[in-house]
Design a protein with these regions (language model features):
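Detector for outer-membrane/organellar transmembrane beta-barrel domains
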Residues: 118-197
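Outer membrane beta-barrel
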Residues: 1-108, 119, 128-135
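Outer-membrane beta-barrel proteins
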Residues: 12-16, 54-57, 110-114, 145-150, ...
């Protein structure tokens, strides 16, 4: 069993920062989870990064930090997000011959009498393969908005291959909503890292 409490703050003022709408004090809004782990994998409850976000930033040579990071920012705020609370995740065990993955469901905390009781719900999954220099994964997600027309789907895929002297990255991310006049965003990422020193 385990737990994880993570928050951010400005090192000069101590003001709480990041992980969602932060108040004046320190908050565990980056991650706050409890987990049960074993040979079966891991079951995790709480607030954490969404699988769609994790998969989109895996193709970024800056990860999800730094001046050059794409940050996997969604065009449908509040629907396809960086982090979600009230979630349950299952993570595959690490002994599957290089295969890894995660399934995540988030409850939107709506009353059954609400006009759209699915608002805030989120379902995502990613499956990848990592072996030697190769790492690749595919991800899918569905986020529920304030109404059915605000619902959005996300699809992304990435791959990287470590050649020793350089490591190329390539990624693709697509998000589209369910409005009568559909809005679709597609983004591509190509990067390269090289060891120095």
């Amino acid at each position: 069993a385990g737990f994880w409490l993570e928050g951010g703050m400005s090192n000069d003022t101590g003001t709480g920062q990041g992980g969602g709408a932060a108040g004046p004090g320190f908050e565990f809004k980056r991650r706050s989870t409890i987990s049960l782990m074993g040979g079966f994998g891991e079951v995790r409850l709480g607030r954490e990064l969404t699988v769609g976000y994790v998969n989109s930033t895996a193709a970024d040579v800056f990860g999800d930090n730094g001046v050059g990071a794409s940050i996997g920012k969604s065009h449908f705020a509040g629907v396809i997000e960086t982090r979600k609370g009230n979630g349950i995740s299952y993570i595959l065990p690490s002994n599957l011959g290089g295969f890894y993955g995660q399934v995540q469901y988030v409850f939107g905390e709506q009353l059954s009498s609400a006009a759209y009781d699915k608002a805030g719900d989120y379902l995502g999954a990613r499956l990848g393969y990592r072996n030697g220099p190769l790492d690749t994964a595919i991800g899918f997600a569905k986020g529920r908005g304030a109404s059915a027309a605000d619902d959005a789907d996300q699809f992304n895929i990435f791959a990287s291959y470590d050649l020793g002297v350089v490591k190329p990255f390539i990624g693709f991310n697509q998000e589209k909503n369910k409005a009568a006049v559909q809005v679709k965003y597609q983004s591509y990422l190509l990067g390269l890292t090289a060891p120095v020193g």
